[in-house]
């Protein structure tokens, strides 16, 4: 048997006599800084976000209000600036816009030039300006001389050994007399036979040609009286005084010098005069 001392017996009795305490569950756990840090940071962030949102809203409202105030302020001062500009403009233009005379009751307005009382009166200056405007010098338009073609139905014979000279003279004659009839001969040996077969109002001959030159043709024409009513014109580069005298002795009526730098009127009138003079001799 186990022996128990009085102290142990007393302790056992006290334990058995006292009611059993209900078992307690310890729900508290060990809590440290690292476990609560995430929670604290989340709470802090949410609070700062709400504060920042509120501050942003306040700033936007304040910005809109300041923009509106700035706009109204600018509008107000812009209108004031415009009024000031108009006032300054009026002050600058008034002395030049309205001019009065001390000894006259009338008012004269000169928007361009100020009035000088020592030289002329405003009334005289206005009258002189009006008269100068009315009496502007009218420059006459240049007079162009229009050459009208002659519609006479002439018949011409052109004799030249150079085909280019033939074409040039042919073109000029058609400009002068659009209804004329022209025969061109490059071989001067054919002229005599053609003159016996066909009549012409005038013949245009070159002087320097091979075989039969212009002097030979002129002498042949003037020896036959039936050609007296036909005009004869020399078209040549020979224009000395001796040559012109020789042409006249051979019965050539007129000489055009090459190149043909004559006005159309001069050539047309010269040809008309030659033909009319020859026809009137008969």
Curated annotation (Swiss-Prot):
| Record key words, sorted | Phosphoprotein
The processes (GO biological process) annotated in the record are: filamentous growth of a population of unicellular organisms in response to biotic stimulus; phosphorelay signal transduction system; positive regulation of filamentous growth of a population of unicellular organisms in response to biotic stimulus
Matching entries from Gene3D superfamilies are given as: 3.40.50.2300
Which Pfam families does this chain map to?
Answer: Response_reg (PF00072)
Q: Which residues form the Response regulatory domain?
A: 155-273
Q: Transmembrane helix: is it a keyword of this entry?
A: no
Q: Give the span(s) annotated as Disordered.
A: 12-31, 41-84, 112-139
Q: What is this protein called?
A: Stress response regulator protein 1
The species this protein belongs to is Candida albicans (strain WO-1) (Yeast)
Name the gene for this chain.
Answer: SRR1
């Amino acid at each position: 048997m186990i022996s128990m001392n009085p102290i142990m017996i007393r302790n056992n009795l006290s334990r058995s006599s006292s009611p059993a305490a209900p078992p307690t569950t310890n729900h508290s756990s060990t809590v440290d800084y690292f476990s609560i840090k995430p929670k604290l940071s989340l709470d802090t962030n949410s609070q700062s976000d709400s504060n920042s949102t509120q501050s942003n809203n306040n700033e936007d409202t304040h910005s809109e209000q300041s923009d509106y105030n700035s706009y109204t302020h600018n509008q107000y001062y812009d209108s004031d600036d415009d009024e000031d500009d108009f006032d300054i403009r009026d002050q600058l233009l008034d002395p030049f816009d309205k001019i009065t005379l001390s000894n006259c009751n009338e008012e004269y307005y000169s928007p361009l030039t100020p009035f000088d009382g020592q030289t002329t009166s405003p009334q005289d200056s206005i009258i002189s300006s009006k008269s100068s405007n009315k009496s502007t010098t009218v420059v006459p338009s240049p007079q162009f001389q229009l050459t009208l073609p002659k519609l006479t139905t002439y018949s011409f014979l052109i004799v030249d050994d150079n085909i280019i000279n033939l074409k040039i003279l042919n073109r000029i004659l058609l400009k002068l007399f659009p209804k004329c009839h022209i025969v061109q001969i490059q071989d001067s040996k054919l002229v005599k036979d053609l003159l016996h077969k066909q009549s012409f109002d005038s013949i245009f001959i070159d002087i320097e040609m091979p075989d039969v030159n212009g002097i030979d043709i002129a002498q042949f024409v003037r020896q036959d009286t039936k050609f007296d009513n036909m005009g004869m014109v020399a078209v040549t580069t020979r224009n000395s005084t001796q040559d012109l005298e020789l042409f006249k002795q051979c019965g050539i009526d007129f000489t055009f010098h090459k190149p043909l730098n004559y006005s159309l009127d001069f050539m047309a009138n010269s040809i008309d005069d030659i033909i009319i003079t020859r026809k009137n001799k008969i």
